[in-house]
Amino acid sequence: MTAIRLREFIDRRPAIPPSIFIVHQGKDLRGYYTGQLARVHYDYSVKRSPRPLIDLDIPFKKKSQYQPQLDQQTLIQYICFRRRSKPAEPWYKETSYQRDYSLPFYKTDWDRKLATVSSNPRPLNSLPEHYCCEGRWL
């Protein structure tokens, strides 16, 4: 009985593993969901303009969208003028705390009493006439 032999095709070139030496075109991309894969191929036939040299460019002055009005510029110049022309010494002589609490009704010494129970039985916070009419209470 004769056997039918199939032809054998022998490749005389050495076998190269395809994953190491063969360059795959494109780039693999993963999708938003799991299991989505795609391959992107770049078209290099389209000529792109060369990238400008950033270091050689002269930076231009940017114009802001907000342009101050003349009144604002005048006010800013006035504030700067007042800061330069006014000496700094009076600013440190009196603080806002000293200014607020240096009113006459806070200065009560032992010889200057605002009121006593015998001379004025009303509450102390109702004594505004004591300051304007001091001669009447003596």
Swiss-Prot record:
InterPro entries: SPMIP3. It comes from the Eukaryota. This is Protein SPMIP3.
